[in-house]
Every structure is written in C-alpha cells, then in structure tokens.
Amino acid sequence: GWQIQPNANSVQQELQKALSTLLRRDMEVVGAGRTDTGVHARKMAAHFDWEGEELDAPQLTYRLNRILPRDIAVKDIKRVADDMHARFSASSRTYHYYIHTCKDPFERHYSLQMNFPLDFDRMNQAARHFLHHKDYAAFCKAGGDNKTTLCEVTQAKWVQTSPSTWYFEITANRFLRNMVRAVVGTLIDVGRGKISESQFLDILHNGTRSDAGESMPGHALFLEEVRYDL
C-alpha cells in the first residue's frame, strides 16, 4: 500500500527514506491517493516541498531508482507551482481491476481468477448507471476520513483483452475507501445472476454497504492514471 503504517513497509515510507537520504534532510512525500495493501499503481503521483538550490531532476530520478526497492520505480520528477497538491489538485483518477477466466499461473499475483461464467453484457449494462449517479455510500467501507460520499464517475466499463481476460475500468474525480473493490464485487454478482439489474439499482440508490457485493481482493486492482488540469 501507499500510506505509512506501523509494522509494515509502504511506498510512502520507502520514498521518504530514499529522498531524505539523498537530500540530507527529513522529507515528507504526499501521494495522490491511499492505495490499500496489495493494490498496485502504474502511475501514482506524489509531491514533496523543497527549499534550496535547484535540483537536478534527471539525476535525482536516477539516484532514487538506484536505492529504492525493486518493486518501486520513479518515472519522472518535475517542478510544479507552489500551490500544487498531489491529492487535492488531481482532476481525476483511473483504476483497472483485472480478472481471468482460465487458470494462468503468471496472472495470479495481478489478476483474479473467476471459476464461474459471467455475463459481461449485463455487467456493462449495470455499470453504465454509474455515469448518472453521484452518491456512493453503498460502496464505501466504514472508518474512512471521507466528509462526503459524492463522486463523479465519468467512465465505467468492462474491457475484454483476450478470450479469457478482462478488466474493469473506472474513472472519477475521487474515490471512497474500498469503493472500486466493492463496485467490482457488486457487478460480478450481476454477472453471475445473483442480483437483477433492478436490485442493482436499488442498491445503488438506497443501499448500504451490507447490501452491496463483497470487496474483491486487492492484488488485481491497479491505479492506472492520475490526471491534473495544468
């Protein structure tokens, strides 16, 4: 996961430790989101404040990648405006959730194997309702720091990449704690025929977290992109 936590490694902790070592002062790194343990990120954005001589960004990128663990890579470092904030300045975020329907040992750490048939047409039909809905209280895990459960979803669809592999793509201005994994679990219930589209709509508009589907495992979830209006 991203966020520093006791008795566990995190991306934030490793980045702060590496930056502090190279810049020879205590550094704080702020990420665009708080991915849970086991969730991956292809394009996480983060910022740190710096007062001092101009940094050589390419050289700092190179040196960071030399000392960071093998499962963390810095792609680029850019100077931005002083009021830029990795989390609060983001205009949208995109997540993918990967599933496969045939056993594949090479996919098992990054995709969830489905051992039952799914109706992806029904799942996509249900997913389209997210584009016209704002309140996602039914898909929010208790205990988060969200002051509101309102989100603006602009993309929600299942995409097939091979006869046996799919991913769910969802883009929104913000996401609630555990929201994507709960959304995927509920859509899978639709695809299995466990709930009808009308039942799905009732959960969407009137439901609580206990009415929605189970939270799917984190290892198949990827933060794919964070966008900013610069």
Where are the predicted features?
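Structured-RNA-binding interfaces characteristic of tRNA pseudouridine synthases
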Residues: 1-230
